[in-house]
């Protein structure tokens, strides 16, 4: 009777615990590999375009580490052993790690693309934006601002015409975009560093809303300043800026 009602159930519980412990070790090991891979992505030290992706990955790693089940020493009582044989599912943690790691790595690639990109890259991506035409790059001989390649200034300035620009007097139609300047549509300015791009953006902001010298909209993306004409409506500026940014940051 003692064997049937005490020893046998205990032995079964012990066997189940050992089997469960082996499964936990395997699942812990698999999740730990994903944690290590995610941590390695962070430890590489590359910054993302969207810092939120880095924060999300950091949280996912922390949550995954907290979820790892600790395998204790074998309890003595049957009831305690059975209480440890609970189902273990790391699928939610695994999915969170995979998704946040992919988003972070994609954002890192995006920032690389908009960090001192080549003039050819900017022209190529700008050419994919709807209603943009007459794309022209400034040269040292022909640059409206006379600033190309100077210390702290842009290394490329790519002007363009925007087909939806309201131009009732025909001031900009039929003229080269580089002659129209930003007023005729917009311009993409490329800088060597984020600091230089931000300085340029801050300078332009001084003239925001001015009636005579109005820089239009301007936004820093990486080391690029996206500018659109002040003659566009606010919604047109926002939509065009967003489409240009999407084109520059699209990862193949």
Residue spans of the language-model regions?
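Stable alpha-helical elements in mature extracytoplasmic
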Residues: 93, 118, 122-125, 196-203, ...
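A short, solvent-exposed beta-edge/loop patch
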Residues: 179-182, 202-252
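Short, solvent-exposed recognition patches
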Residues: 127-211
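Solvent-exposed, charged interface segments at domain starts and junctions
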Residues: 79-82, 86, 110-145
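Amphipathic alpha-helical assembly segments used for oligomerization, scaffolding, or translocation
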Residues: 1-118
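Second-shell loop/turn segments in exported
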Residues: 109-113, 185-190, 225-233
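Sec-exported extracytoplasmic/periplasmic mature domains
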Residues: 43, 62, 66-69, 73, ...
């Amino acid at each position: 009777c003692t064997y049937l009602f005490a020893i046998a159930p205990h032995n079964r519980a012990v066997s189940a615990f050992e089997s469960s412990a082996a499964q936990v070790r395997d699942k812990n090991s698999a999740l730990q590999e994903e944690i290590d891979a995610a941590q390695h992505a962070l430890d590489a030290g590359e910054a993302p375009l969207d810092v939120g992706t880095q924060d999300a990955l950091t949280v996912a790693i922390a949550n995954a580490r907290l979820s790892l089940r600790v395998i204790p020493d074998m309890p003595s009582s049957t009831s305690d052993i059975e209480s440890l044989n609970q189902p273990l599912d790391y699928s939610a943690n695994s999915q969170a790690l995979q998704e946040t790691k992919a988003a972070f790595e994609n954002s890192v690639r995006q920032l690389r693309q908009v960090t001192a990109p080549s003039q050819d890259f900017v022209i190529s991506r700008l050419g994919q934006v709807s209603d943009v035409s007459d794309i022209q790059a400034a040269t040292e001989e022909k640059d409206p601002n006379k600033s190309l390649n100077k210390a702290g200034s842009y290394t490329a300035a790519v002007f363009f015409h925007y087909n939806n620009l309201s131009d009732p007097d025909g001031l900009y139609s039929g003229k080269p975009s580089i002659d129209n300047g930003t007023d005729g549509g917009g311009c993409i300015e490329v800088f060597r560093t984020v600091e230089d791009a931000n300085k340029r953006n801050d300078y332009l902001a001084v003239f925001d809303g001015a009636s005579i010298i109005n820089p239009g909209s301007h936004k820093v993306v990486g080391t690029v300043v996206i500018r659109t004409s002040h003659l566009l409506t606010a919604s047109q500026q926002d939509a065009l800026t967003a489409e240009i940014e999407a084109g520059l940051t699209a990862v193949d």
